[in-house]
Amino acid sequence: MEAERRCPYCGHMTPWDSEECPFCSERRGFFSSLRRDTFLGGVFVLLILLFVVTGFTVGRYHGVERGLAQDWYSQGDQALKAGHAREALSDIRNALAYSRDNPLYQLRLAQALVATGRVQEARIYLLNLRERDPGNGLVNLELARLAVREHAIPEAVRYFHDAVYSEWEGDPAVQRRAVRLELVKFLLDSDQKAAARAELIGVAANLPPNAELQTQVGALLMKAGGYDDALRLFRQALTAKPHWAPALAGAGECYFQTGEYARAELYLDQALRQDPHLTQAAAMRDTARAVLDLDPFIRWLGEQERARRASQDFDQAMARLEACAAERGIDLKAADSGSLPTLYAEATTFRPRVLQRSLSRDSELLSTTMDLVFEIEKAASQACGEPQGLDRALLLIAREQEGARP
């Protein structure tokens, strides 16, 4: 009798030399008929395929999100550039819904918030961006501009300085110079001339040999009262472009403001030859010429010319006094303790002594005459405002003489 054994799965007797139970094999499906290692290998391959498909699907989904975010951002960016801040705000918020942590989108959203007057919300976004990236130049610049809106000078200066020393895309030197010049304009608008001058000196030290830039910074230095530093920049610009009207006019104004009227007249006249439409330069040149024609204290003048000028200046001052009194409705001959009637009475009494032959022989009389001229011009200026033409020239001579005295 052939040896048999009992199947451990179904309990039926099977031949001893049979590897499989004939009863079990009849009931098994495809998967149960596979060997264990074959089955596991198939499962592993299936898992890999599922992983690849899932990764592809997720990647495609994120790609679609990025595309939607970029589309919304581009639309919002264009709207903001066109001045449609409210539309831009909505579009950029949509972009952030698909790319929540994008720092560029957050920065542009802050700019849109500022444009719509929602400054505090913008500040929160900007401060969060700054906390994540303290060296971001654009973020620091936007914070500086917020401080400028609120006229918070120390805070604005701090953020401007942070922006200057931050990281910038493109040409960092150009970006930092632009930030510094923006700071300078804010300081000038805030009447912080000394601070503006200090910033401009730093800018001037790092300027490339570019006549336009040198002239631009020179013009700002003049506004800050740095005439000597401005003049150096204008002369550097003229080395490259000797006939460039803006640099010639700038140099002429520097000489004018420092009392060098002969050089001022020369440079301003050259500027006007290049560009006759420089009205401010023309007025300044004419005033410089008037100073040179009226000043009796110029060293190389002879005694007769000094006397002639002093007499002419006295007549001009009296005319200014009478015109100012008429403008203000003041009766110069009335008994009045006001400055204009008092000066008029003094000048009327003094007038018979203002003779050219007397002035040419008596330098002390000439000085006394000019002192009275200066007093009249200053009093008229206080009563009727800054003069023009010959009277402005006399006032400039007066200020120059006061500065020359110990």
What residue spans do the PLM features occupy?
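Eukaryotic alpha-helical solenoid repeat scaffolds
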Residues: Q257, A262-P406
